[in-house]
Swiss-Prot record:
Annotated segments matching region Disordered: 32-116
Annotated disulfide bonds: none
Function: Involved in apoptosis. May play a role in nuclear function controlling cellular proliferation coupled to mitochondrial biogenesis. Causes impaired growth when overexpressed.
A GO CC term assigned to this protein in UniProt: nucleus
Main location: cytoplasm
Source species of the chain: Saccharomyces cerevisiae (strain ATCC 204508 / S288c) (Baker's yeast)
Residue(s) carrying Phosphoserine: S75
Protein name: WW domain-containing protein WWM1
Misc. remarks from the entry: Present with 6020 molecules/cell in log phase SD medium.
Residue(s) carrying Phosphothreonine: T78
Gene3D superfamilies reported for this sequence: 2.20.70.10
Bias kind Low complexity: ranges: 80-116
InterPro entries (alphabetical): WW_dom, WW_dom_sf
Length: 211
């Protein structure tokens, strides 16, 4: 407990009271032995401090604070005040949102897709039949050759017959029955040219696509 420096204690003879500023208390020195101690020696008295004790001042201050404080509200008055305050304030009602029945979530049905048709079998590839034009060409050439040979033989026979008539019959005038010699009566030239002779037969038969 802190002690006051202005109120020194009264010690017996042979003792001295010294105030310690660091600890704010008194310690006592024995003058005969020059030793010090914190405990007061026997016979030490303390003078009465000036002014009223601290407890009286505290009671007065607490009484003054109690007089100045506002009167407490009773338990009956508090609900009335609150009821009046509630009556003055307008009441706002928030409309409740209608609750709709919850239906189970519908599951969408997706039809299964039909399986993809199997790939159509590939058509077998058949090579085109060899054209018979070449064969027909050979046949035509052969037929042309035969016709040419026949015409040549026929023309030669008629030419020989004409020479025989010209040499042995005597008359200068040559009678042409079927006009085999052409219009100009060209003799051998007309016979070979009109009938085709060997030229036409060989040209058609051997100059074609056979070789």
């Amino acid at each position: 407990m802190a002690q006051s420096k202005s109120n020194p204690p009264q010690v017996p003879s042979g003792w001295k009271a010294v105030f310690d500023d660091e600890y704010q208390t008194w310690y006592y020195v024995d003058l005969s032995t020059n030793s010090s101690q914190w405990e007061p020696p026997r016979g030490t008295t303390w003078p009465r401090p000036k002014g009223p004790p601290p407890g009286v001042n505290n009671e007065k201050s607490s009484r003054q604070q109690a007089d100045q404080a506002p009167p407490p509200y009773s338990s009956q008055s508090t609900p009335q005040v609150q009821a009046g305050a509630q009556a003055q304030q307008p009441r706002y009602y928030q409309p409740q949102q209608p609750q709709y029945p919850q239906y189970p979530q519908q599951q969408r049905y997706y039809p299964q897709q039909a399986p993809m048709p199997a790939a159509a079998p590939q058509q077998a590839y058949y090579g085109t039949a060899p054209s018979t034009s070449k064969g027909s060409g050979h046949g035509g050439a052969m037929m042309g050759g035969l016709l040419g040979v026949g015409a040549g033989l026929l023309g030669g026979a008629m030419l020989e017959h004409a020479f025989d008539d010209h040499n042995y019959d005597g008359p200068d005038t040559v009678v042409v029955e079927n006009n085999y010699y052409g219009d100009d009566a060209g003799g051998s030239d007309g016979g070979f040219d009109d009938a085709g002779g060997f030229d036409g037969g060989f040209d058609d038969g051997f100059d074609g696509s056979d070789f």
